[in-house]
From Swiss-Prot:
Belongs to the multi antimicrobial extrusion (MATE) (TC 2.A.66.1) family. One of its GO terms (cellular component) is plasma membrane. The keyword Zinc-finger does not apply. Multidrug efflux pump. This is Probable multidrug resistance protein NorM. Its main location: membrane. GO terms for biological process: monoatomic ion transport. It is found in: Cell membrane. Disulfide bonds: none annotated. It comes from Thermotoga maritima (strain ATCC 43589 / DSM 3109 / JCM 10099 / NBRC 100826 / MSB8).
């Protein structure tokens, strides 16, 4: 069966209620992403004013961290989708089993990531063209961040559990508290304020892991108090069928993120051909572009949660209604942000650097990315929709194809042979965005996602 984003599958009187549900879930998730963005901006701004080379090194180490945390992404996405479907199906026993097994997976992934700490130098050495301070900053930051992985793991999975239960407000509040703590500690530890020693890059990393452990403690208290998860009824032993379902749904998303993050690392190597200044401009451009991620992330989370819930109920009309209304909201928000980015690139870039050369090379690419928010709105909507129904494999395959046939080859040719520097690399990135979003949309419109949606619903029902 073929579908359309322009067709309303719901009775007109139900559309306002669906839109209200989406906004209710999306706004706190947007708020959480705003706070995450502010944390990223603060980190980048503090380090940018401390040393732009230190800022670039930290940017590289963060990309490596995103690559190595694939199991964490699997556990997080799997928890959100399976818990949402189980709640929609009204299966309390399945919800409890999935909740406990999500806790076990959070601890397991934290241990695995922490065990990678001794390999931090090896992981950074994949970049062959690094300069001295950039290389040393990247290695120092990654070593500290990996040592504190348990806090990241618990925060990510427990927040995902709450989103699956339809609570996006609590993760926002906890993220806000931890990020404001992080910003304070960043300033104090990077520059040596309020009695702290000046620690530079190490200070930024220590501030991050301390704040994440505080957040992990708060979220642990919250999920054990929540009635939906029934965790206080007693320990449920690890159950392979529940863990397998969480990972079956979440693992393709983890591989998708691994493929994307690996592509981003390759992309960074292409940028380093153009010079360290081009890479610094890229990091700043990504932070400016993150303004559009706020609405995209929030609405995508809301779509995943509601689609999962209605899929668990077996209500296809509401699944389609959520997807259509989510796309309309995403389009409205992201195009608005895109216009702002296009019209005012320089003031946004100056938040992160005062270096005239970096500002100049960043302006045009940032303006261009503002024009392509329409495609990013499609991409984020389709991600939320397909994941909510358990269709996590097709986005993974599409991302792999798009990264390796559009982003990387186009960027390499533009940078290496046309000498276009940062602009050339971002032409490759835009080609990837257009190709990826179009393929995901075509898959949704074809109706081929329905079989997996039914399978996800039936498997969750069996977990009780």
């Amino acid at each position: 069966m073929r579908y359309s984003l322009f067709k309303n599958y719901l009775p007109k009187e139900e559309v306002p209620e669906i839109r209200k549900e989406l906004i209710k879930l999306a706004l706190p998730a947007m708020g959480e992403n705003v706070l995450q963005m502010l944390f990223g901006m603060a980190d980048t701004a503090f380090l940018g004013h401390y040393s732009w080379k230190a800022m670039s090194g930290v940017g590289l180490s963060n990309q490596v961290f995103w690559v190595v945390q694939v199991v964490l992404i699997a556990a997080s996405m799997g928890a959100t989708v399976t818990i949402a479907n189980a709640i929609g199906a009204g299966n309390r026993k399945a919800v409890r089993s999935l909740a406990w097994n999500s806790v076990f997976l959070a601890i397991f992934t934290g241990v695995i990531l922490t065990a990678l700490t001794p390999l931090s130098d090896v992981l950074i050495n994949i970049f062959p063209n690094l300069e001295g301070e950039i290389e040393s900053s990247a290695k120092e930051y990654l070593k500290v961040i990996l040592s504190g992985s348990m806090g990241f793991s618990i925060m990510a999975v427990f927040s995902a559990m709450l989103r699956g239960a339809g609570d996006t407000r609590t993760p926002m509040i906890v993220t806000g508290l931890t990020n404001f703590l992080n910003i304070f500690l960043d300033y104090a530890m990077i520059f040596g304020k309020f009695g702290f020693p000046e620690m530079g890059v190490r200070g930024a990393a220590v501030a991050t892991i301390l704040s994440r452990f505080v957040g992990a403690g708060i979220l642990t208290y919250v999920i054990f108090k929540r009635e939906e998860f029934q965790l206080r009824k007693g320990l449920v032993p690890p159950k392979w069928s529940s863990q397998k379902e969480i990972l079956r749904v979440g693992f393709p998303t983890a591989i998708e993120n691994f493929v994307f993050s690996t592509g981003v690392l390759m992309f960074a190597n292409i940028l380093l051909i153009a010079g360290a200044e081009a890479y610094a401009g890229h990091r700043i451009g990504i932070n400016v572009e993150s303004l559009s991620f706020m609405p995209a992330f929030g609405i995508s989370v809301a779509i995943t949660t509601l689609v999962g819930r209605y899929n668990g109920m077996g209500n296809k009309e509401h699944v389609l209604g959520v997807i259509r209304q989510g796309w309309i909201l995403s389009l409205l928000f992201q195009v608005t942000v895109g216009i702002i980015i296009f019209l005012f690139p320089e003031p946004l870039i100056r938040i992160f650097t005062s270096d005239p050369q970096i500002i100049e090379i960043s302006k045009l690419p940032v303006k261009i990315i503002g024009l392509f928010q329409f495609f990013l709105a499609i991409d984020s909507t389709m991600n939320g929709a397909l994941r909510g129904t358990g269709n996590t494999l097709p986005p993974m395959i599409i991302t792999f194809i798009s990264i390796w046939t559009a982003r990387l080859p186009v960027a390499f040719v533009m940078v290496k042979y046309f000498q276009l520097g940062l602009l050339g690399a971002w032409i490759g990135m835009i080609a990837d965005i257009i190709f990826r979003s179009t393929l995901k949309l075509l898959f949704f419109l074809s109706g081929k996602w329905e079989k997996r949606a039914v399978l996800t619903r039936e498997r969750v029902k069996e977990l009780g």
